Swiss-Prot record:
It comes from Aspergillus flavus (strain ATCC 200026 / FGSC A1120 / IAM 13836 / NRRL 3357 / JCM 12722 / SRRC 167). It comes from the Eukaryota. It holds the Pfam family Glyco_hydro_36N. This is Probable alpha-galactosidase C. It is an enzyme of class 3 (hydrolase). It is found in: Secreted. GO terms for cellular component: extracellular region. Homotetramer. Glycans are attached at residues 49, 57, 162, 186, 194, 366, 433, 452, 500, 720.
Length: 751
């Protein structure tokens, strides 16, 4: 017990011995752009508006966190840990630890837990050395951000446990222009006995004692990405996925903010795991008020054995800092992902307006039906026609969701001569009154198999299964085990054959169920590594194909998928009112350029709601990939007459959506008049999306203040005169709406 003043003083001295006194900077190595400054004792990463500092305690070799926030220079004020007043004190748990290991007196959740062959889970990871690398190495087998030596600098800190011969390398890559620090960790077995990694975080940070709040994205099928903001309480709180994919339930995104932080003001820290598998986000406020945030593998889905010389690499975690509120945080993510994550040539290229056959026809079609739909699509001005589920399966034809998955050959009853004649006929059609040929796209779900399929009958061992336990069906299908190289090769070969057979310029890659009955905890990560190999091989082999990710909507809307697929279907819910919430929630981390959004028929297939076509179109064109999800023959004549104009408007705004900055002016959770402003990359153009959700009877409409404009410049506002940026931001503008579900799209031009 530390009941006496003498014992309290001794305890305080012990704390300082473990974690040192205040830090000072540096007789040091400095990168050419000053982004990394290090001397082996103290480390600093510097962006345009961010500083990240940590140090080594020279007595123990522990890494201690000092600062992650606004830019700082020079020496740091000498802080101290919590005083050891009366009572039992867990020493390590009272200080800010940069990469907390397990079993040495820190009883908060660790960043790493490793079981040795003897059963021990204690690690004593001490600082050994560091290296500074211009640019950024890729992660083996995993998606990762990229950049040149001018864009990014990487610091690698090497830790070592002398007792177990376990090495951990911590990687910090800073993109100064984006105030972004990307972290990952390697665990290497340098000993002779096997070890098992049971927990590993890509990112960990201990915030100082402050009142903080956390923001996450929760949901389920058809209601993804609902923003949730709550106070960080004492104790452990967090979320994650154990479904085998990032999932609709929780996105691998976290923001930490102050209670006073708003969209446009205050500090915000954002974290996003570049991973598509099961994950864990943990936030723990310890007894001393320090808040620990960790993102990484889900420990319940990880038991990774390492033999001598073997290494486990964690996914990357992107962290950004903004002093310009939650909106500033989002814009940093958007810019970074557009320029340094998405590798597709389509990352910032105009996306063709498309029509997808699903909600128009579902499974009920044949060659003539599809051609008729393509003809009507082209007449409206659509430039890409997509044939969704139902085109494949020979012995087990895909006429419902009961059969066919896994057999990627055209259904001979529907397409007796294969797809080639259909594709040739469709791609001869002209979009609207233009000379542009209609393009052809296809839906696939290659990671699945129906029990009613030739593939399953020939290879029942290829699906996920746990011995003799029943194989649980979901949507009448099973998951192929992409941990198996032969399964990966099969998928690569089948999709290659399809794309080589016809002029297919777009692929929608779906994934419609969770993973059950996995054979081992490590299988989840092995699956994801296999999936990334498939994605990388096919997107490299077919760089001119526009790939779109999907998982029953936004179930895999994560940075891992974005590296390979430049756009993702945001939600199966196409109801325009709900889509505003879903799309603005998704935009907390992900660029609107990556969102697939479609104008669908009414009453809406998911909600039964009827909303005017103009409102539906305006909501959909806020996504980078605008499309239609309907049968034009079923439209009312007045609706059909409006669609070509909406397609033309979507094409006009698309370049700004793809490369510009997004400002969420009002949120649908907080206002009857949500509004979003997009400003072009050069600042010369802007487009405002402004909505009225419910009726506004006998009451004034509020003024709307814009953001992000040049206060000294003058802007013309869609035929309503010219005004200074200062006037538009400080006074605002006001519009009259006619009814519920009314909307406006307003263009601004800098003069």
């Amino acid at each position: 017990m530390f009941g006496s003043p003498k014992r309290a003083a001794l305890a305080a001295a012990s704390l300082l011995a473990i974690f040192g006194n205040g830090p000072s900077v540096m007789a040091q190595e400095t990168s050419s752009n000053n982004a990394v400054v290090a001397d082996g004792k103290t480390f600093a990463l510097n962006g345009e508006n961010v500083s990240y500092r940590f140090r080594v305690n020279e007595t123990t070799g522990d890494l201690v966190s000092d600062h992650f926030g606004g830019s700082i220079t020079g020496d740091l004020f000498p802080g101290f840990g919590a005083e050891a007043l009366g009572g039992w004190v867990g020493l390590a748990g009272r200080f800010r630890r940069e990469f907390p290991d397990h079993g040495r007196g820190d009883f908060r959740i660790p960043a790493v837990r490793i079981r040795q062959e003897a059963g021990y889970t204690v690690t004593d990871l001490q600082y050994q050395s560091y290296s500074v690398i211009p640019g950024k190495p890729a992660l083996p087998g995993l998606p990762s951000t990229f950049g040149s030596e001018e864009d990014v600098t990487t610091l690698v800190v090497h830790l070592y446990d002398n007792y177990s011969s376990i090495a951990v390398d911590l990687s910090y890559s800073i993109f100064p222009k984006y105030d972004a620090i990307v972290r990952s960790a390697n665990v290497t077995n340098k000993g002779t006995q096997n070890i098992t990694v049971e927990a590993l975080s890509s990112f960990s940070f201990d915030f100082p004692y402050e009142d903080l709040e956390m923001i996450s994205l929760r949901g389920d099928w058809a209601r993804e990405a609902h923003r949730q903001r709550r106070k960080v309480e004492y104790g452990l709180q967090g979320f994650g996925s154990s479904t085998g994919f990032s999932s609709h339930l929780h996105n691998p995104f976290l923001a930490i903010v102050h209670p006073s932080t708003t969209e446009s003001q205050g500090e915000a820290w954002g974290f996003n795991l570049v991973y598509t598998g099961s994950f864990s986000v943990d936030v723990e406020k310890g007894s001393q008020g320090l808040t620990r945030a960790l993102l990484g593998f889900n420990p319940s889905q990880l038991s990774w054995q390492l033999g001598a010389g073997e290494t486990l690499t964690s996914p990357e975690c992107v962290s950004v800092y903004s002093s310009d509120g939650i909106g500033g945080m989002s814009r940093s993510f958007h810019r970074l992902y557009r320029n340094h994550l998405i590798k597709s040539k389509f990352a910032t290229s105009d996306r063709p307006p498309l029509l997808n056959s699903w909600e128009g026809l579902y499974f009920d079609y044949n060659e003539s039906t599809i051609y008729r739909l393509a003809e009507e699509s082209a007449a409206l001005g659509v430039k890409l026609f997509v044939m969704d589920d139902g085109w494949f399966g020979d012995k087990y034809p895909r006429v419902s969701d009961n059969a066919g998955l896994g057999d990627w050959v055209p259904n001979p009853d529907r397409f007796p001569d294969g797809l080639t004649p259909l594709v040739e006929d469709v791609t001869k059609l002209k979009a609207g009154n233009s000379s542009t040929d209609l393009r052809f796209g296809l839906w696939v779900e290659p990671e699945m198999a129906n029990p009613n399929s030739t593939l399953y009958h020939e290879h029942p061992d290829w699906v996920l299964h746990a011995g003799q336990y029943p194989r649980t069906l979901q949507r009448n299908q099973l998951v192929l085990n992409l941990a198996l190289p032969e399964v990966q090769d099969y998928i690569i070969d089948e999709i290659t054959n399809i794309l080589n057979s016809s002029a297919i310029s777009y692929v929608k890659w779906d994934f419609n169920r969770a993973m059950h009955e996995t054979p081992s905890p490590s299988n989840d990560h092995e699956y994801i590594l296999g999936m990334y190999r498939v994605f990388d091989t096919l997107t490299t082999r077919f760089p001119d194909v526009l790939w779109e990710g999907c998982a029953s909507g936004g179930g895999r809307f994560d940075p891992g998928v974005l590296e390979y697929f430049p756009q993702i279907w945001t939600s199966d819910n196409t109801d325009a009112l709900m889509r505003i919430t879903i799309q603005l929630g998704t935009s907390l981390a992900y660029p609107p350029s990556a969102m697939g959004a479609h104008l669908s028929a009414v009453p809406n297939a998911q909600t039964g709601r009827t909303i005017p076509v103009k409102f539906r179109g305006h909501v959909a064109m806020m996504g980078g990939s605008f499309g239609l999800e309907l049968d034009p023959a079923e439209l009312q004549e007045d609706e059909k007459a409006e669609v070509p104009g909406l397609i033309a408007l979507a094409e006009k705004v698309n370049p700004i959506i793809l490369t510009g900055d997004m400002w969420r002016l009002r949120l649908p959770e907080e206002s009857n008049w949500p509004a979003v402003l997009f400003i072009s990359e050069d600042g010369n153009q802007a487009v405002l999306f402004y909505f009225q959700l419910g009726p506004n009877v006998n009451h004034a409409t509020p003024w709307l203040r814009l953001q992000g404009l040049d206060p000294k410049a003058t802007y013309s506002v869609d035929g309503n005169g010219s005004y200074s940026g200062a006037t538009l931001m400080n006074m605002g503008l006001q519009y009259k709406f006619e009814s519920d579900y009314d909307s406006k799209v307003v263009f601004l031009q800098k003069q």
